Design a protein with these regions (language model features):
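Conserved small/polar residues in nucleotide/adenosyl-binding loops
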Residues: 215-220
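Intrinsically disordered, compositionally biased terminal peptides
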Residues: 1, 221-222
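Well-ordered alpha-helical scaffold segments within catalytic/enzyme domains
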Residues: 60-78, 134-145, 187-199, 222
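Extended ligand-binding clefts on enzyme/binding-domain cores
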Residues: 2-63, 76, 83-183
Length: 222
């Protein structure tokens, strides 16, 4: 959805629940600016409601999948019209990400926001669930500036990210979906898969080994 406000019939409301389990404005979600090139999401991969409806990791993933679609349409289906449509939409979303989702962080410089609304508001965070900002290299997103990618990774794996936690036994990214202070194995796996150093990969493997079980969210303090 690139015109959620004007054209979408979608809404979602749930009664008697926590605020992250339903959408505001009678189920439409927070207001976003239409026609900016980004695609709308009501909920994050964690199943929590988006604060701002343009979820950047999902838009990044969309550009990757549209690239696959372009290749399949061209090489397998021999459908040049479909290939051109996929390529055009991929470029539109990619350009919107690069122009609207890069913001300045006091500690890390230019980084990708997790969510934006198209009006200038944004959310600086990352969640353990994929697609995530931490997973952009794993998913295959092609950023215009690698320094922004590295800055974003450094931000995500720091206490500047409100869902990053450190304890005496482990450290990593957690989620709004579980209790504060708990890290997720899925984020540790993505961190390891995208790491460029053997030392970091080994440290993550040791962290996973020491928890004894691969479950959703261990405490880094136990």
């Amino acid at each position: 959805e690139q015109y959620h406000e004007e054209k979408s019939p979608y809404s979602f409301q749930r009664k008697g629940c926590y605020y992250t389990d339903t959408l505001s404005r009678e189920g439409k979600g927070a207001l976003v600016k239409s026609g900016v090139g980004l695609t709308w999401s009501g909920f994050r991969p964690s199943d929590d409601a988006c604060i701002y409806g343009y979820l950047i990791p999902s838009n990044m993933f969309a550009t990757v999948v549209l690239g696959y679609m372009e290749t399949i349409a061209h090489e397998v289906l021999k459908d040049e019209a479909l290939a051109a449509e996929a390529a055009s939409l991929k470029k539109e979303i990619h350009d919107a990400i690069e122009s609207m989702a890069i913001v300045d962080n006091y500690y890390y410089g230019k980084v990708y926001a997790y969510e934006v609304d198209g009006y200038g508001q944004y959310m600086l965070m990352d969640d353990a669930n994929v697609p995530s900002l931490l997973a952009m290299d794993y998913l295959g997103y092609e950023a215009d500036d690698r320094q922004v990618v590295e800055n974003t990774r450094n931000f995500v794996l720091s206490c500047a990210n409100p869902y990053y936690y450190e304890g005496s036994c482990a450290k990593g990214v957690g989620s709004q979906h579980t209790k504060p202070g708990y890290i997720w194995h899925i984020a540790l796996a993505i961190q390891g898969l995208t790491s460029k150093t053997k030392e970091e990969k080994l440290a993550i493997l040791n962290t996973m080994k020491n928890t004894c079980l691969l479950y959703t969210s261990p405490s880094p303090r136990d």
